[in-house]
Amino acid sequence: MFKIAQSDIQQEIKDTKFLAVISDDTTDVSNHLQNVVILRYLVSGQVVERFWSFCSMKQGDAVSIANVIDACLSRVLPNAEDKSKLIAQCYDGASVMSGLEGGVQSIVKQSYPHAHYVHCYAHQLNLVLQQAVSQVSQIRLFFANLSGFSVFFTRSPKRVAFLDKSVGRRLPRSVKTRWNFQSRLVLTVYEHQDDLIECFQDIIVNWNGDQTTVREASGLLKCLQDRDFLGYLDFFHKIMPHVEILYAQLQRRQLDPVFLQNCKSNFIQAVNNVRSTIPHIFPPITPASTSAKRPRVDTSDEEKSRILHEVSDIIISHFCSRFEFSNHLASATLFNSESFEKYNQAFPSQILKSTAESYPMLDESKLRSELAVIYSRCEFRQCCGAVALLHLLQESNLTETFSEVIKLLMILITTPMSSSEAERCFSTLKRVKTFLRNTMSDDRLNALAMLSIEKKFIRESSNFNQRVIEMFAHLKERRATFLYK
C-alpha cells in the first residue's frame, strides 16, 4: 500500500518541471532518530507538499542525513538529466544541516547543483525574537518573570484550582523554540490582569500548605502591581499579535517568496507603528505611587522608553538581515507588484543577472523581454504574489507567450519558505507510534503515516483500493481466492 502511494507520487513528479525537498529529524517514543522527507512541487498550478517517508537513522551526522535524502531523491529522480529538477532544499539552521563545507545542504548540492538551500523562515523568526529578548537585560528579566506565571500553575493541581476559580482558563506554557506560546502567554496575562491579581490574593489568604507557594504568589502579585512590568507587558501585547500573524503566514503551504516579501513589509510597518506609541506606554505616576516606598534603583521613563526603542530596533534590524532576499531568492523581487512601475522606468538588470546565474535553465534575454512587457502593463500590477500572477497568465492563455516568466514563477512557487510541513508530520508520528505501538516496523509506520498525512491524495487516487487488494493477493499463495475474474 505504501509503495503504491509512492508510485503515484513518482508519477506526479515525473510530470512536473521542478522539485524541492524538505527534511527534518526528531526522536520517536522508542528514542529512535527519525528523519522525515517531504517533496514539494506543482500539480495543475497548485503547490503540494507530499510526505515521502520516515527514515530511521542510527546517527544524526550530516553524511547520514544526506545519504537518507539522496536515497529518496534517487527514486523520484532516477535519471541524470532529472537532477536539474531539484531547485531547492529547506532545513532548519542547525550547523549539521546548513554548513557550507560539510553540512547536509552542501553534500546534497554536490549531486544536485541547482538545489539552493533555504533556511526555514519560521525558525528565523524565532531567532529574531530570541535576539531581541536576550540582548537587553531589563527585557530578559521581564520574560523570566513572565514565564514564572505559567511555571507557577504547572506544579500543583491545587494551584490550578485557584486559577480556574478566579481566571477560568489555563496559562500557556512558555517554550523557547515556539514563540507563539510566548505570545499567547503575553496576551493571556495582559487580558486577565485583574483576575490574576484576585487569584494570587486568594492564594495568599486561603492557602493551606507549603509556604513556598505563598512566597511565589506574593512575588508574582508584586509583578502585576509593578509599573515597569506593566509597561513592558503593554508593549509586547502590541507587538505579539503581529508576530502571531506572521508566524501563521509562515506555516502556509501556498507561501512563496513574493508573498513573503509583502508579509515582511507589513510586519516592519506594524513594528514601526508600535514603536511610535512607546512614549505613551508607561502610565503617569499617581500621587499614591509617589508616596509609596520607591526602590533603591529606579529607571526613569526616558530610560525605559530608550530600552523599548532599542528592542524595536533590534527586532527590525535582525528581521531585515535574516529576511533579506539575496542570491537565488533575489529573483522574488522581480515580481513585487508594488515595484512594477519603478521597474518600468529602470529595469532591474542586476537582479535579472543574478537570477540567470542561479537558474541556468532560464533564457536571460527572453526573460528580460517578457518581464519588460509585464512591467509596462497595468493589469499585472494588481497581482499580489507569484501564485496570483501565475494563475492570471494561465487563465489568460499566455503560457507560451510568457514561457520564461512562467518557468521562473514555477521555480519561486516550488521553493519552500519554511519546514512547517515536517513539524506536522512529527505530530502524526506521535499519534501513530505510541508507547503501546513502539515496536512497529518502519514499513508499517510509513504506511500508517501515509494514510494519515496524505489521506486526501489517496482518496483522489484512481483505483487505489483495487490496487492494494491486487498487491496483497499476489504476495503469496492463499487458500482463499481474493481476485475474481
Where are these predicted regions, by residue range?
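Alpha-helical structural modules in large enzymes and assemblies
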Residues: 1-485
